[in-house]
Amino acid sequence: MSYIYLFITAAAVTGALGSSPSYNGLGLTPQMGWDNWNTFACDVSEQLLLNTADRISEIGLKDLGYKYVILDDCWSSGRNSNGTLVADKNKFPNGMDHVARHLHNNNFLFGMYSSAGEYTCAGYPGSLGHEQEDAEFFARNGVDYLKYDNCYNKGKFGTPETSYKRYKAMSDALNKTGRPIFYSLCNWGQDLTFYWGSDIANSWRMSGDIYPEFDRPDSRCPCDGDQYDCSYAGFHCSIMNILNKAAPMGQNAGIGGWNDLDNLEVGVGNLTDDEEKAHFSMWAMVKSPLIIGADVNHLKESSYSIYSQASVIAINQDPKGVPATRVWRHYVSQTDKYGKGEIQLWSCPLDNGDQVIALLNGSNKKRPMNASLEDIFFDSYLGSEELSSSWDIYDLWANRIDNTIASNILKNNKVTNSSLYNATELSYKEGLSKNDTRLFGVQIGTVSPGGLLNTTVPAHGVALYRLRRSR
């Protein structure tokens, strides 16, 4: 049975009966949270996780939806005489169940890491051949999320079936525990994961590891352009490199199973503010998980205001669960120091009948850009209702909090501004159905039938608009 048939059938059932195509009932929207790897790598500890969770809560990010706290590699000291994984007592003196209890008591969800190989990527014991006992270890310790990597896999890759079977072993083991555990594959898109990932998992990485560069080429990330089927994914992949690889994959993702473009680099490295906005916007558009990769205890104000932009998060968490499609891509002569220069239009429908678009400027100069309704509603036929209607344009970044408000929140460790959205009190689905203005940006104009949406987009930047049918 083909993936396309499964996806369409599941989508039809979802619309008719309100059920989910998720293989385990989880991942109805892309996961949100924090992972230590991008900033801390192997420098992990109980104190780091619990202090980070406290900070995420204090500055309002938990109530915006960032609820998974994910412990990455380097947490174990090996296996005991029974073959059971053992947490490093120097790093986690009270054990993993203590970490889980603290997180759960504060309304977080706890994530851990292993690899579908003999070892993890950092050389710690992997789970290949130990799937059931390791799944039971995770369940026993209150784990809600497993990131499952691809290192030291003993050559068990090369065909989709080979990789599928290796990752399915852990999927089956997790399900046998009886504990709901979000299953996040990290096999770098190897062996066409987007075709089979949703059968056994809730998300799957589709490229090599991200790096905080907008479009810098790197020989360690050898595949470029639209090379989504990359036999050697590598690492140090730029934002644009990953985004362009993801362009054709949206059709294979949706409710219950998401393409994972890797953790967010907002607040990591030296990206400009426009680059960070573009990065966050495009991950939201394609329905990638929104996993913070930064040190939240040392976030700059501008990065915090990006992570807290509820009108953009609402695109990512839209109940319809449709990833954006890249409508067009044009190379331009205004190239940056790496010889890169392109512009793109992305568009996707939303659950309430709205449409969201991103005009992405990958050139080195601010430039005027436009989009016609025919491009925006790219699947509509001539004379359709979408093309014959007028649409109000809402800028999804226009209501971004300023640095003064962000600074007050970060310094006082408390959200006092009532205009900030709280998804714990009112979910994004509920807020959208109630037309909560904080989720819709600011109206800046209207585009009429046959007209053009015109704007100016900064270099390495994005214009992100929600279109609502004019009344």
Swiss-Prot record:
SS bond partners: 42-74, 121-151, 221-237, 223-230
PROSITE patterns: ALPHA_GALACTOSIDASE (PS00512)
Location within or outside the cell: Secreted
Keyword Thylakoid attributed: no
Pfam families noted in UniProt: Melibiase_2, Melibiase_C
Protein's UniProt keywords contain Secreted: yes
Glycosites: 82, 175, 270, 361, 370, 417, 422, 435, 454
Gene designation: MEL
Binding site for substrate: 72-73, 147, 205, 251
Residues forming the catalytic site: 149 (nucleophile), 209 (proton donor)
Any one GO molecular function term: alpha-galactosidase activity
SUPFAM superfamilies per record: (Trans)glycosidases (SSF51445), Glycosyl hydrolase domain (SSF51011)
One annotated GO biological process: melibiose catabolic process
Similarity remark: Belongs to the glycosyl hydrolase 27 family.
EC category name: hydrolase
Enzyme Commission number: 3.2.1.22
Signal sequence residues: 1-18
Listed GO CC annotations: extracellular region
Protein name, entry field: Alpha-galactosidase
Keywords carried by this UniProt record: Disulfide bond, Glycoprotein, Glycosidase, Hydrolase, Secreted, Signal
Catalytic activity: Hydrolysis of terminal, non-reducing alpha-D-galactose residues in alpha-D-galactosides, including galactose oligosaccharides, galactomannans and galactolipids
Subunit-structure text: Homotetramer.
